[in-house]
Amino acid sequence: RGVTAGPHADIVTEAAKVAKERGLTVEVVEFTDYVTPDTALADGKLDLAVYQHRPFLENFNSKQNTDLRVVADAVIQPMGFYSRRIKSVDAVPEGARGAIPNDPSNGGRALLLLEKAGLLVLEKNRGTEATVADIVENPKKLNILELEAAQLPRSVDDLEIAVIPMNYVISAGLTPEGDGFFFEDMQAPYALIIIASRPDNTESATVKTFVESYRSPQVAEFIGKTFRGAVKPSW
């Protein structure tokens, strides 16, 4: 099963223990970027991928001409603003440097969050397809830097704001309560992580057993104890 490092790997590893009790052996394969897992899934090197939200999967399918499918909802983990220097949107200085993910849907997602915070205005109706070229108002003259998502936590020491997906927050040892100050709503569509598979195996016994194992009471309890509200089960 393909996952990105951090909480997704931890949760899938726990789900693998439950799956083993149900007769299914799961090999957990960790990746450090957002594109390789879906590529490996589409190529048949993986059976499932657990790390992305639905808009990211749709973008991948569109760009790569693939037909990966959502087989279940996984966990909820909102993106947020992180900083060592400031603790509120009001404290963001003019000319602040802000880092966002450089992959298409999470970059757009970060720009939408900056807009929600009142720091930017974007071209209308762009959604997660928004890019820095769609910024139509930038009242604080923010300098937006696009970085690999896994590198964003390192930028917290050097920049005023980093807009970071929760899995990389946790894997870097940051905490929402200690280092963050503005977040997506828990109900935001981009906060919901899904389990993806190929069309040829969505109905397979292997996939069904893994999904049932992942969405089990044991895994829900593990998530609650381990992540203390930063990540929540969707079931």
Describe the role of every protein-language-model region.
Residues 78-89, 191-204:
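A bilobed periplasmic-binding-protein/Venus flytrap-type ligand-binding module shared by bacterial periplasmic
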Residues 29-39, 126-154:
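Short helix-initiation/N-cap motifs at beta->coil->alpha
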